[in-house]
């Protein structure tokens, strides 16, 4: 049966009150949803996002998928059906058979179907128990208002080009903007429990493919491979590394993931361990923000740090729990109990340049609330030339497309000879296999360390007179310049990416184990930062120096072991551009 014709003028009248007068409407069209009778949709593409206004039996309801939650779109054609199944667009599908689509240039397309299908990919926020998570949503628009496929495809391509321009913030054109730069992705297969390959395959590559972002993927082959790689390659050939001119991105595959957790916290992006959807979207979008970097100096090395410098209790846990790496982040909890039982003390001198006024810092952020898209559960189908649907054989074609599970990628990740990146990666993306001829041999690197010069005296020279000195026995000293230093370690609640502040925590000997336990429990919520006792002190500083006595102990920089002995650090604001989630 044919569905009744819709009066477009009356539809405009009903729905006009739902559209924000400040939003600019770029495109709009009327669609029918095939799985539901008497349901008409007015779909608008605005400066805010994709608006779906549903009109059913006189009632009206509007929902919007925000532009910041849309990663990309693609035009498709229906696939040629198997012999005997019938190729007429009006023929019935058997059971709940789903529409099969192929690329518009495929040789396996159905030439009898004049429809053009636009798939719009989004990852929207959904409540999940006590937190939020992103859920993949696909909106399918079927264009068949014209008698020829070429005309329908032209209309679909216009929507696709407009979506792409809005996503990247460029003026609207008739053709999608071309991404002529690639991402450089360095993957550490040994990070954390060793599941980086699987996480990239399942969580990152699909988002980059849907966003049509080309990339080069290099799997690290030995310790410091990434450092050697960027020292000896021209990194300006890539649009980002996953440096003030070449932005840096982080995708958490390890155990700590402090920087990734910090980004999600500061930019209202839900963080779910081993679910990198939000940060993958950020990588595809390429929005950036400046980040401070800390210059760290030891007796034999100069390095640049983005997360922490540690001495004592937490550093002991970080390094000594490596033997439990296979269990992931839980290793920190297990080893914390062990170190609490066998509590150690370290004698030395801690000196620092205190920042006196931090009153202008923002208050700690509140937990994330749901303020993103709410998508329409259903796929949409445009009317034909007479604005009628005269058969219902496709009633189940898109029934599951909005909230259906993404098909598991089964491409061969481990192919010895493959240089393609697999996982339906965008055309031109490359995977550089760990089985290359150079994988077993580490070539010498002849490059120097570049970075800002120090403003401090040399490591063994006297410090300025205004510095504060703390001498005695310490349980731990830990400095951080990020909000989180681990998935559940809210170390510095007031910290920002580019505030020029190092938060220096000192816990002196004499504190009881119960007080340390209470302190550790408070770290998960950040309440420890308000404690100021004779044994616990947290100070905002611009630089510090630690001079431990003896030779037995552990010092770490960003969770990595460094030589034990004098160490000093100073912060340099806005040194790195970091890829961050989109807040627009």
Residue map of PLM features:
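Conserved beta-strand elements of beta-rich interaction domains across eukaryotes
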Residues: 38, 48-51, 57-58, 72, ...
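Structural signal for hydrophobic/aromatic residues that build the beta-strand cores
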Residues: 43, 50, 70, 159, ...
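Generic C-terminus detector
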Residues: 148, 153, 157-161, 541-542, ...
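ATP/NTP phosphate-donor binding region
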Residues: 2-243
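Catalytic core of DAGKc-family lipid kinases
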Residues: 220-222, 228, 235-239, 245-482
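Catalytic phosphate-donor-binding core of small-molecule kinases
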Residues: 286, 336-352, 441-444, 453-455, ...
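Eukaryotic intrinsically disordered and solvent-exposed regulatory patches
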Residues: 28-30, 35-39, 57-59, 102-107, ...
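Eukaryotic short linear interaction motifs
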Residues: 51-53, 59-61, 80-82, 127-130, ...
């Amino acid at each position: 049966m044919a569905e009744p014709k819709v009066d477009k003028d009356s539809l405009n009248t009903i729905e006009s009150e739902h559209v924000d007068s400040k939003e600019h409407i770029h495109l709009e069209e009327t669609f029918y949803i095939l799985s539901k009778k008497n349901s008409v949709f007015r779909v608008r593409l605005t400066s805010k996002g994709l608006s779906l206004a549903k009109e059913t039996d006189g009632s009206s309801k509007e929902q919007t998928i925000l532009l910041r939650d849309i990663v990309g779109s693609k035009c498709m054609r229906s696939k040629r059906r198997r012999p005997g199944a019938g190729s007429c667009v009006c023929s019935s599908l058997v059971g709940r058979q789903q529409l099969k689509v192929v690329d518009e240039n495929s040789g396996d397309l159905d030439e009898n179907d004049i429809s053009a299908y636009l798939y719009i990919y989004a990852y929207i926020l959904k409540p999940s128990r006590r937190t939020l998570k992103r859920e993949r949503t696909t909106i399918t628009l079927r264009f068949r208002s014209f008698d020829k496929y070429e005309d329908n495809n032209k209309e679909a391509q216009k929507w696709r080009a407009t979506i792409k321009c809005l996503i990247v913030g460029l003026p609207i054109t008739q053709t999608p903007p071309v991404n002529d730069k690639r991402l450089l992705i360095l993957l550490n297969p040994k990070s954390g429990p060793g599941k980086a390959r699987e996480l990239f395959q399942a969580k990152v590559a699909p988002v980059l493919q849907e966003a049509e972002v080309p990339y080069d993927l290099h799997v690290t082959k030995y310790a410091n491979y990434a450092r050697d790689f960027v020292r000896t390659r021209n990194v300006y050939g890539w649009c980002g590394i996953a440096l003030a001119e070449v932005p840096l991105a982080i995708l958490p595959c390890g155990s700590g993931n402090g920087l990734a957790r910090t980004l999600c916290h500061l930019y209202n992006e839900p963080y779910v361990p081993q679910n990198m959807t939000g940060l993958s979207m950020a990588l595809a979008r390429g929005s950036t923000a400046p980040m401070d970097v800390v210059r760290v100096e030891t007796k034999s090395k100069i390095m640049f740090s983005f997360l922490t410098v540690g001495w004592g209790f937490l550093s002991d846990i970080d390094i000594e729990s490596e033997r439990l790496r296979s269990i992931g982040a839980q290793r920190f909890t297990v080893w914390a109990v062990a170190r609490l039982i066998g509590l150690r003390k370290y004698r030395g001198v801690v000196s620092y340049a205190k920042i006196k006024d931090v009153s202008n810092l923002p208050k700690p952020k509140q937990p994330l609330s749901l303020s993103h898209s709410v998508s329409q559960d259903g796929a949409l189908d445009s009317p034909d030339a007479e604005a009628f649907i005269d058969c219902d054989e496709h009633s189940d074609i898109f029934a599951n497309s909005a909230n259906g599970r993404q098909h598991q990628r089964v491409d061969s990740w481990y192919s010895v000879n493959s240089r393609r990146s697999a996982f339906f990666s965008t055309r031109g993306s490359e995977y550089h296999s760990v089985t290359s001829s150079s994988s077993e041999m580490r070539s010498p690197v002849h490059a120097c360390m570049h970075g800002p010069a120090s403003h401090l005296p040399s490591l063994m020279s006297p410090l300025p007179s205004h510095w504060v000195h703390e001498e005695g026995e310490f349980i731990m000293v830990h400095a951080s310049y990020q909000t989180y230093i681990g998935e559940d370690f809210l170390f510095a609640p007031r910290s920002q990416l580019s505030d020029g502040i190092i938060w220096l925590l000192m816990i002196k000997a004499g504190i009881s184990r119960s007080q340390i336990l209470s302190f550790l429990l408070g770290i998960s919520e950040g309440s420890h930062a308000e404690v100021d006792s004779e044994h616990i002190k947290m100070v905002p500083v611009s630089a510090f120096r630690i001079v431990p006595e003896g030779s037995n102990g552990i010092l770490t920089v960003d969770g990595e072991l460094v030589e034990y002995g004098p160490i000093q650090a100073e912060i340099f604001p806005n040194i790195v551009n970091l890829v961050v989630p989109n807040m627009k």
